[in-house]
Each structure stands twice: as structure tokens, then as C-alpha cells.
């Protein structure tokens, strides 16, 4: 019995398990969406729980998952990136620049390919930004299926690249797809950020103060019309790091926070996120081949993303603008570049904005195309890295 519990504990702690759990919930949602329970599933996830009258917004269960729970995931990412920037693989500026440059390439090429393929249909030209985003949660989930063979520096490179990608996507949403950005709330968000910077500068070590200001930051960003999960990344990066503090109490609090966030995200938030965002009913896709939209999205994500990410990474290193992460080769960068083609939720979010004034069928086609493209990208990226590390393991 004791051996059983030891094996069970090891299984749940294995990073592969969390990645498989994410994919399991994704396919569970797809399965339910194509059964007689489709209407029930759709009703539950979209049920308006709260109405925010001042901003004419309904808060459904899906909003709670995407706007509130996912903030905790982004908070963990922000803390991790801050750690790597101060004492880890991103401490070297030339290595920290690389994911930013790679992200730029990963946004330019997909958009160009999408525009080239869909140029004959002006009704879908507004969807160019669908292909620029990377879904951090799913990309990391797929990478973690490979388990302990993945170097930590490669995971950090993917996280950093995806963060730059998301920031780019959020800026695109703000400038191209937002009809009513609340400037007052943007100003309030800026003031909250400056306040957090100030208390960090004063070496305040009470973690609860940062959490309180983090809640204020989330609310102000949410009400501004910008995707609220960015508040998690901002808070994580702005929180003080134990490397320049002598407070053992703060260090213990941060260690507990990191451990709690890791468990919560891996085994609860990310699987729920997958379940709420993967429900696509295939019966809505008649005459799919008659539209240029699926081809623009597919080739933008599956080809444009890896070409842009890899090419800009390669040129950046060759022209000595940046350096590769420690222990990482261009072959591994190539594998990661395919995983960047997993657009999924952010791409779906942008498609809803891009085609909100067009018929609903276009949005269904876009969602289906994003799903297929993301699956293909994840399979290619996974197999590429799997066989690469298998080959390295055999050599050693």
C-alpha cells in the first residue's frame, strides 16, 4: 500500500501528467460539444452570472475562468520571468533580448502570410491579427509532456517569447480592435503600477500589500477594455525578488506563493481553462473549403509562426544582437518555433473581435481553423523535440 501511494505521488508530480491533463480536458470539451449535451455545455459556460452596468459587460463562467483564474497563471509566469532576469538564464541582456526579437518575427510573418492568402476577400481582411498570438498555457502544456528531458532554459525561452507575443497581441487589440478603451481606467492602471514600483523601491516585504494592489490593478485593467490577465504578469514582474532582500519571512512567503500557484495552475486552473475554451461543434462548418479564411489561419499559424520565430532568432544571433540560452541549440529553437503556432484561446479571442460585425458563421470557421492549426502545430513541435531529445539521449 505504501509503494502504491509513493508511485501515485510521483505520477502526479511528474510534469508530463499536467500536460496530459490539459489535453485530456481539451478533447473532453470537444467530445461533449459534438453530442446531445452541446446545448447544455454551451448554456453553462456562457451563463451570465454578473452584469456590469457601467461597462455593459456580462460576466459568465467562461469570463471567470479566462479573466480571473488565468490571472493566477500569468502571475506565476511573471514571477518566474523576474527570477530568470535577476539570477537565471535571462540575466544576460543579450540572452534576454532574443525572445523579444523572436516574438516580433513570430508576429510579422503570420500576418503577412494571412494577408497574402486572403487578399481577394476583403470581408475577412480584419482577421490578420488572429495568427500573431501564442497560447502560453497550451504551448507550455505540450512542452511539459516531454517531462524532465526539457532544459529549464528552453521552458523559460518559450515563456518569455509567449509573454512578448501576448503583449504584442494586447497592443494590437488596443490599437486595432478596441472601440472604447477607457482612458480614465488606463490612467488609474498606470497609477497603481507606479504605486507598486514605489513600495518595491522602499523594500516593503509584506506580500499581502502586493496582492491588494494586484487586485486593484486587475480591476482597473479589466474595466479599461484591455485583457485583464496582463495584470498577473505585471504584478509578478514588479514584486520584489528575494535575491536583493534580507527578509527570511518574505522569502518563505514567496516560496509558499510559488508552490501554491504551481499546484493550482497545473491541476485546476489550466485543465478548467482547456475545458471551457475548447468546445467547438463541428456541425457548424458547412462549405468550409469555399472560404479563404481557414487557409489564411492555417498557413499563418503552422508556417508563418515557425518561420518568423526561427528566422528572427537565427539572424539575431548571427548578427550578434543576442545570444542563445545556455545549453540550447538552434534545433531546439526550431522545435519551440512550431509550438508558437498554438494560437488557440488568444487567437479565438481576437477572431471574436475581428469578425464581430460579420455573420456568426465566419467566427465558427475561424475557431475551427484555429483549433486544427493549433493541433497540427503542437503535434509537429512535440514530435520534433521528442525525436531530437531521443537522439541526444542515445548519443549520451
UniProtKB/Swiss-Prot annotation:
Cysteine disulfide partners in this protein: none
Superkingdom of the source species: Bacteria
Example GO BP: regulation of pH
Catalyzed reactions per annotation: Na(+)(in) + 2 H(+)(out) = Na(+)(out) + 2 H(+)(in)
GO molecular function: sodium:proton antiporter activity
Parts of the chain that traverse the membrane: 17-37, 59-79, 97-117, 127-147, 156-176, 181-201, 206-226, 260-280, 292-312, 333-353, 368-388
Subcellular location: Cell membrane
Keywords per UniProt: Antiport, Cell membrane, Ion transport, Membrane, Sodium, Sodium transport, Transmembrane, Transmembrane helix, Transport
Membrane topology: Multi-pass membrane protein
GO CC, any one term: plasma membrane
InterPro entries: Na/H_antiporter_dom_sf (IPR023171), NhaA (IPR004670)
Any Pfam family matching the protein: Na_H_antiport_1
Family affiliation: Belongs to the NhaA Na(+)/H(+) (TC 2.A.33) antiporter family.
Known role: Na(+)/H(+) antiporter that extrudes sodium in exchange for external protons.
Name used for this protein in its record: Na(+)/H(+) antiporter NhaA
Organism: Wigglesworthia glossinidia brevipalpis
Species classification: Bacteria, Pseudomonadati, Pseudomonadota, Gammaproteobacteria, Enterobacterales
